[in-house]
Regions:
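Transmembrane beta-barrel domains of Gram-negative outer membranes and organellar outer membranes
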Residues: 22-254
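Cleavable N-terminal export/targeting peptides
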Residues: 1-31
Length: 254
């Protein structure tokens, strides 16, 4: 509980510290999946799990674009998390990952994004990871609507390729329907993210919905700071959780 409160407080205070420097000019707020930029982002997510359990994860993310057109990027993620399903509510290392992103076929009306991610079996305790090394592929089609909104449906496939023999294999598919409305104030952002999730290995399926609310706070660390809050809901008999909430602060373009 102490680490969870400290993490949430640090994330919120980091963003509030930049609010007084807010700017009126439009900035890249990180909602367009075809715009790759340098990102430093800590987030903390709490999930109310089914069965009366709970989990929390502090994710430390760093993204670096590269290539002549900055159409590639590499993201490193280290999670520090807890899950009390086995009675241990302490935080420890989860499964770290690295993700390569490539933007292609970009025009004024649409663009494509491919992401390849490797998730490594680095969790310090069994309940904090899958026990497997997992490869995840994501294909996104981003459509830029005449209203200025973005609709970017995606398909995500995850499969385990190695790991602990006693742990179940990973074979999941997610159909995601990401939408970004155009807001009058460019310093504000909203994303709506409904998804249909299939766990083929365990014969489970469930629905999820996450809505992100954000505010550009102004200059931070040589870039632009953004505070975000993301509540989420889950539905279906196989859902892993009932609801969740994530708070975050990210610096873009530093």
């Amino acid at each position: 509980m102490t680490l969870r409160c400290a993490a949430i407080g640090a994330v919120v205070l980091a963003g509030l510290g930049c609010t007084a420097q807010a700017q009126d000019k439009p900035v890249n707020n990180g909602t367009d999946p075809t715009k790759l930029t340098t990102i430093l982002q800590p987030t903390y997510e709490y999930l109310d799990l089914v069965g009366g359990f709970e989990s929390g994860v502090l994710r430390l993310n760093y993204t670096q674009p590269f290539g002549e057109k900055s159409d590639y990027s590499l993201r490193l993620r280290v999670p520090v998390q807890m899950n009390d399903v086995l009675g241990n509510s302490g935080h420890d290392l989860g499964d770290a990952s690295v993700m390569l992103t490539h933007v292609f076929g970009l025009t004024r009306t649409h663009g494509w994004v491919f992401q390849g991610e490797a998730v490594f079996d680095t969790a310090a305790r069994p309940e904090l990871g899958t026990g497997k090394n997992v490869l995840k592929g994501t294909l996104i089609y981003a459509r830029f609507l005449p209203t200025g909104a973005i609709f970017a449906p995606a398909v995500v496939q995850s499969n385990s390729v190695s790991g602990q023999a006693r742990r179940a294999d990973v074979n999941t598919t997610t159909f995601d329907f990401y939408y970004v409305p155009k807001l009058a104030d460019p310093r504000n952002l909203v994303t709506v993210d409904p998804a249909v999730n299939f766990d083929w290995e365990n014969d489970k399926e469930f629905l999820s919905l996450a809505v992100t609310y954000g505010r550009v706070t102004g200059p931070a660390l040589g870039g632009v700071g953004i505070v975000t809050v993301k509540p989420s809901l889950f539905a279906g008999g196989d859902r892993p959780a009932d609801w969740g909430i994530e708070v975050g602060f990210k610096v873009l373009g530093f």
